[in-house]
Amino acid sequence: MNKIRVEYFTDTLCIWAYSAQVKLDQLKREYPDGIDLKYRFIPIFAAAHDRIQKGWAEKGGFEGYNAHQLKTARAWEHVELHPGIWVDTVPASSTVSHLFLKAAQLLEQDGHSGFAGESTVPGHTRFESLMWRIRCAFFEDCLDICDLAVLTAIADDMG
């Protein structure tokens, strides 16, 4: 059977990508040998602070964006949102996490021994587990995923 290539464009700070993970997992479960999933990182929130400050200036700024995100997430049973995202923690950019994840993805593709081992999330590769944990670090734990120390701690926790 030929695999269908699915190119998934994503940003680690995008709430829609965070909520869509459940659908990607379902796709992988239902067609384990039928899809070739390729992750592509795009800089929607490359300048997150500026994007929200300007885009939400007349709608309450960061507090307004926070309220919008919390309201949006209430419609989804499968996600949790920390009440302080975009207020208590405002990552400057998603770019640092994208570069960190791309490096991990390349290590996994090359079979690097430092990135070997079991995934921490069933049905995920180690790279996918890391990506999920980074998303959760922001959306659920309100951590600054623009901070390399935060990203390194997440990877270290995976072993």
Predicted regions and their residues:
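Extreme N-terminal starter segment of soluble prokaryotic enzymes
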Residues: 1-7
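Short pre-active-site segment immediately N-terminal to redox-active cysteine/selenocysteine motifs
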Residues: 10-13
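Short, cysteine/histidine-rich loop/knuckle motifs that typically chelate Zn2+
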Residues: 16
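Structural alpha/beta surface segment adjacent to cysteine/selenocysteine redox centers
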Residues: 19-138, 142-148
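Short, intrinsically disordered, charge-balanced linker/junction segments flanking boundaries
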Residues: 138, 153-159
